[in-house]
């Protein structure tokens, strides 16, 4: 199977289901940003040994979100994976576990101090952009709202992970004011 089809050479692509849309379509922008986020998570997976299982689960969930967003219709006849409360709860559990190892947050933290911590912040901002892109679709079914909730919680996870990396490396957080 060839990787190239030449079907996108005129600025169009297909949704899951076959409908052709412009590559500037909001849905393409949304799942493209989720794909970008997944690549950033992959880099964290490669660089940070302490959260490999969680980061791998996050990557699989982001791939599922991409499939959901790329479906042709809001109520697709195609069997798609679901984002559930369990996916969101996994992130919340990890946030709580990491948070117990950290001092209380009293000031705004600047994204700096260690390259991996800073990369968590870069990834967090990509996550927030992905969330905004999904919200811009203004899709109401629960499956889309769960995607928004997951992305929102994932940005929190990445923030707390950035703090934990600093603590593990005995680096003081740089704060604003």
Regions from the language model: what does each represent?
Residues 1-177:
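Phosphate/pyrophosphate-binding loop motifs in nucleotide- or prenyl diphosphate-using proteins
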